[in-house]
Amino acid sequence: QMCAFKSGGLFKASFQMAAIIAGVKKDLLEALSEFGQSLGLIYQIQDDVLNITENDLSKMKGLGEDITEGKISLPVIYAMENLPKEKSKKLAQILSLHSQDKKLIRQAIDLINEGQGIEKAKIVMEKLFTEAWEKLNPLLDDNEDKENLYSLAKFLITRQV
């Protein structure tokens, strides 16, 4: 829900406004709105993944900043579901501390990885993209704009910054 309200709503509104200005038909407006919502969710999930993986973004923002904030992201949720009870409790405990201790942050990241939180979050991103694109694709003309939209969406899933 947090993702839907945060980035999902912004992307959805952007797509809706562009579609309304372009004067598209209702079915295309709805598909574009849903696609925008999905892209926003994908963007936020990827941002959460990047925060707990070593990459250019985490070098700028700080690795595990979301852990320090105690953020319950999608990778954390999946990890907690998949970890044994004691390890899930340990992850929850670390998050509740809002600690900047690098060892605790590393331990939390290791637990998220052990619980396959990142892998499952990536599966969700691909599913969101595929479902939204399958609804939108047949409504769009085959042209460079369609290819650019597809490329932008795929970039959001694979971006490293």
Predicted regions and their residues:
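All-alpha prenyltransferase/terpene-synthase fold signal
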Residues: 1-161
